[in-house]
Amino acid sequence: MVLTRREMLAMLAAAPAAPVALAAQASQLPLNTSGLEHVGFTVPDPQKSAAFYGRIFDPQIFQEMKPPLRYYCRLGIGYVAFGPNATATPRIDHFCATVEGYRLDEMRAELATRSIRLTGSPDFNALTDPDGIRMQFMTTPGGLLPTIIASTRVTQDDAICEAVGLDHVIVQVPDLEKSAAFYRTFFGKETARERGPERIWFTAARTRLGLEQVATGQMPHIDRFGIRVAAFNRREVIRKLEGAGVTLLPATGEKLLRFRDVDGFTVEVRGI
């Protein structure tokens, strides 16, 4: 087969681009994420904390098969996880994003070229941002691991709200622009900025990650999170939450509720 001059030039022009195209295809950054899936807590009494959420979102709570016992409450396609520390101040210790076609070893190597250290195994791997906030990755569809079993049903009543999944996670940091630069690596360009208070939003599928300025004298931390729920009667849900002893917080709009959980964290519930 004899190639024309035009065909030869076309082949030569395409050849150097092939490795570049393959490298671009292999990159996992920004993440092809299906969203923020769960948040994890360190609390004095994990069973009590899980039971609190269970009464509101899913009465059947779960636990690890073996000690140290972590407890879980499902939130539709997401969940909240509670690990024990009897003497530590309660804190939200990590949040997790699920990733389509996640390849751990390749991600670890790719992040190493950016001086970001990803540690752990396929079951639990995570990195920390410049302020020590921990972010975990799991392969889509995520969910509870095989080591987790049904624990107990905390009430015979129906759930007060029908959870769909996480809605957002709010991280408070000392330098918004520095943190935004870090999270662009994983979620791409921010999708919104707000004033009063200043807030930067990143979109992760149907969920969002928000950055806020941490208060003077406080350490950087995961401050609060939101849960998407099926459409609800606000007045009826408020009545049931108050009947369950839940402390409600001010909120505006018929589709938004805010409350304080048993460990003092603010939870925001948004109807869809």
Per-segment meaning from a language model:
Residues 1, 6, 18-20, 31-37, ...:
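Residue-level marker of intrinsically disordered, low-complexity segments enriched
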Residues 2, 31-32, 41-80, 126, ...:
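Core segments of cupin and vicinal oxygen chelate
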Residues 2-29, 108-165, 171, 193, ...:
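Vicinal oxygen chelate
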Residues 4, 67, 100-103, 125, ...:
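Alpha-helix initiation/capping motif
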Residues 22-50, 92-97, 142-180, 222-229:
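N-terminal beta-strand motif that seeds the catalytic metal site of vicinal oxygen chelate
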Residues 25-27, 32, 68, 81, ...:
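Residue-level detector of functional hotspots within protein domains
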Residues 59-93, 101, 134-142, 188-223, ...:
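Conserved short beta-strand elements that form part of the metal-binding/catalytic scaffold
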Residues 103-107, 233-237:
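Short, conserved charged micro-motifs
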